[in-house]
Regions:
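Structural recognition of the beta-strand scaffold that forms the well-ordered cores
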Residues: 31-34, 74, 103-107, 115-119
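Flexible glycine/proline-enriched surface loops and loop-helix/loop-strand junctions
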Residues: 38-39, 100, 136-138
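Short clusters of hydrophobic/aromatic residues that line enzyme substrate/ligand-binding pockets
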Residues: 38, 76, 142
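Bacterial Sec-dependent N-terminal signal peptides
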Residues: 1-22
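Acidic/histidine-rich, surface-exposed loop or edge segments in extracytoplasmic proteins
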Residues: 29-41
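Alpha-helical metal-binding/catalytic segments enriched in His/Glu/Asp
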Residues: 106, 114-119, 124-148
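A non-catalytic alpha/beta surface segment that caps or lines the substrate-entry region
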Residues: 41-107
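Periplasmic POTRA and POTRA-like interaction domains that precede
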Residues: 21-24, 30
Length: 148
């Protein structure tokens, strides 16, 4: 019984430690990607491009295989809405009056018959506008999450 309790405590302590280590490793990523330096990461902006390069470099460090058409990057274009109820047009080719940006794509091969795809966007609202919590007030950097 004493051995079982000791083993349980050992496993519990190790699992808590690894969770904290993981959180500590994630914190600098979140701090950088949500920093004012990236000016809200508006789609196709310098800040969004810097964020994409940062994610690409993290993927490299984590030995995640590139799967985009251009290494880790997959270019796309879209035409922003001029009216809030208008449909958005997205394409993998250039659209007139469009914004061109990149998705970052990586692959972890677990040698399985099945693959789970997890997607997320790293661009955001930049300084606001349509969809912004602050669209009617002073211009502010939107660091993330108010459009979710």
């Amino acid at each position: 019984m004493r051995l079982a309790v000791t083993l349980f405590l050992f496993i519990f302590i190790i699992s808590c430690s690894s969770e904290n280590t993981y959180k500590n490793k994630m914190k600098p990523d979140v701090e950088y990607l949500s920093s004012d330096q990236l000016e809200g990461r508006s789609t196709g902006s310098k800040g969004a491009n810097l964020a994409g390069k940062y994610i690409k470099n993290r993927f490299k460090e984590l030995n995640i295989k590139p799967m985009g058409e251009d290494g880790y990057f997959q270019k796309f274009s879209f035409k922003p809405k001029s009216h809030p109820h208008e449909k958005i047009t997205v394409s993998d080719s250039i659209i007139e009056n469009s914004i061109t940006a990149n998705n970052v794509i990586g692959f972890i091969n677990n040698n399985s018959d099945n693959t789970i795809v997890i997607g997320a966007h790293y661009d955001h609202l930049g300084y606001g506008g349509e969809g912004s919590l602050y669209r009617d007030s002073d211009i502010k950097i939107h660091n993330g999450a108010d459009d979710n």
